[in-house]
């Protein structure tokens, strides 16, 4: 009988997704420590044994413990799972760097590119932490609420260290509800999770303008082609983009209104401005921040990404969505 790896794990980030992952891990029987940056909210979660803000009515398993002190949270486990918005990812790494020991291993489920540089988060981690620690990324089609409810979910995991990857797969995988696929392509897994948010904004805009299912499907398909082109230029494996971290995450985010990025796009397509849309959503819209970085990265790599470019024009250059539709439809004829 296969020996199942089990050890405590610390989750940094008590938003909806971080909390959902902590619930899933602890439900699997692993002692899990959840840290968040707001001590008052963490104290409330500890008392009420649930996240009333993000996941109301989903009680915490017994194995889930709330921790409000970062230094203490890092001593609880050698394995750290970071689940924070991409624009604060480097800040969190800088906070934990002096507190880490040689035994720590770092994984993240953050999806995005570094703000203002467009770098993959692995590059950010290597710059701040050096190459002392095994690194891993968890990415794929997962909505926090469904994960926390224990509904069937599948995801991809990639790591710089095969043993770390295998042990984390065993720990996260649950035959009843949560399936984890290993993928050796860290570049592709990270990129798919970042750029799909941008495409989801585009499909939301299209649906908000009433363009229908045909247009939505065209945007998803051509968006996948754009992600693949950019990925290949960065050394990714093309098969990654037809897997969980590519097509899987893209389809989920572009077609279901649980996606904040899609809802953000819907509001833009209905005539709301970006500030109004983000205020109504009330949580981080990763695609808004990553549109600029994706556009600049494509320019740097010399890769044609017309959908990403036009969403950038809407968000940062004041272009109207109806003009974007004309631009995309009026492009020169070409082969697929």
Curated annotation (Swiss-Prot):
Keyword Nucleotide-binding attached: yes
Keyword Membrane: no
Ranges in coiled-coil conformation: none
Source domain of life: Bacteria
Top EC group: oxidoreductase
GO cellular component, one term: cytosol
Pathway info: Membrane lipid metabolism; glycerophospholipid metabolism
UniProt: sn-glycerol 3-phosphate binding residues: 111, 140, 142, 196, 249, 259-261
EC number: 1.1.1.94
GO molecular function, one term: NAD binding
Subcellular location: Cytoplasm
Active site, UniProt feature: 196 (proton acceptor)
Swiss-Prot/TrEMBL keywords: Cytoplasm, Lipid biosynthesis, Lipid metabolism, NAD, NADP, Nucleotide-binding, Oxidoreductase, Phospholipid biosynthesis, Phospholipid metabolism
Amino-acid positions noted as binding NADPH in the UniProt annotation, renumbered to this chain: 16-17, 37, 111, 144, 260, 284, 286
UniProt cross-references to Pfam families, sorted A to Z: NAD_Gly3P_dh_C, NAD_Gly3P_dh_N
Catalysed conversion reaction: sn-glycerol 3-phosphate + NAD(+) = dihydroxyacetone phosphate + NADH + H(+); sn-glycerol 3-phosphate + NADP(+) = dihydroxyacetone phosphate + NADPH + H(+)
UniProt record, GO biological process: carbohydrate metabolic process; glycerol-3-phosphate biosynthetic process; glycerol-3-phosphate catabolic process; glycerophospholipid biosynthetic process
Stored InterPro entries: 6-PGluconate_DH-like_C_sf, 6PGD_dom2, G3P_DH_NAD-dep, G3P_DH_NAD-dep_C, G3P_DH_NAD-dep_N, NAD(P)-bd_dom_sf
Family: Belongs to the NAD-dependent glycerol-3-phosphate dehydrogenase family.
UniProt cross-references to HAMAP family, sorted A to Z: NAD_Glyc3P_dehydrog
Biological function: Catalyzes the reduction of the glycolytic intermediate dihydroxyacetone phosphate (DHAP) to sn-glycerol 3-phosphate (G3P), the key precursor for phospholipid synthesis.
Protein name: Glycerol-3-phosphate dehydrogenase [NAD(P)+]
Organism expressing this protein natively: Glaesserella parasuis serovar 5 (strain SH0165) (Haemophilus parasuis)
Gene that specifies this protein: gpsA
């Amino acid at each position: 009988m296969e020996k199942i790896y089990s050890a405590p794990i610390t989750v940094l980030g008590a938003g909806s997704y971080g909390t959902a992952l902590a619930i899933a891990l602890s439900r699997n029987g692993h002692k899990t420590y959840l840290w968040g940056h707001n001590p008052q909210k963490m104290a409330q979660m500890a008392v009420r044994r649930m996240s009333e803000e993000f996941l109301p009515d989903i009680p915490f398993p017994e194995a889930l413990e709330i921790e409000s002190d970062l230094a203490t949270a890092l001593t609880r486990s050698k394995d750290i799972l970071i689940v924070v918005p991409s624009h604060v990812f480097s800040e969190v790494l800088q906070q934990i760097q002096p507190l880490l020991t040689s035994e720590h291993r770092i994984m993240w489920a953050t999806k995005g590119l570094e703000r203002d540089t467009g770098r993959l988060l692995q590059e950010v981690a290597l710059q701040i932490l050096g190459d002392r620690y095994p690194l891993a990324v968890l990415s794929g089609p997962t909505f926090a609420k469904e994960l926390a409810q224990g509904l069937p979910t599948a995801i991809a995991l990639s790591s710089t260290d095969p043993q770390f990857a295998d042990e984390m797969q065993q720990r996260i995988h649950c035959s009843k509800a949560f399936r984890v696929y290993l993928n050796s392509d860290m570049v592709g897994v990270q990129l798919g999770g970042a750029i799909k948010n941008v495409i989801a904004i585009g499909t939301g805009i299209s649906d908000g303008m009433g363009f229908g299912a045909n247009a939505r499907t065209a945007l998803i398909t051509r968006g996948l082609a754009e992600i693949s082109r950019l990925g290949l230029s960065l050394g990714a494996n093309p098969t990654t983009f037809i897997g969980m971290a590519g097509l899987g995450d893209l389809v989920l985010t572009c077609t279901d209104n649980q996606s904040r990025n899609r809802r953000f796009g819907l509001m833009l397509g209905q005539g709301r401005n970006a500030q109004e849309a983000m205020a109504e959503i009330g949580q981080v819209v990763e695609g808004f921040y990553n549109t600029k970085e994706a556009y600049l990265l494509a320019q740097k790599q010399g890769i044609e990404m017309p959908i990403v470019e036009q969403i950038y024009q809407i968000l940062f250059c004041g272009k109207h969505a109806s003009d974007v539709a004309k631009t995309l439809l009026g492009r020169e004829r070409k082969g697929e």
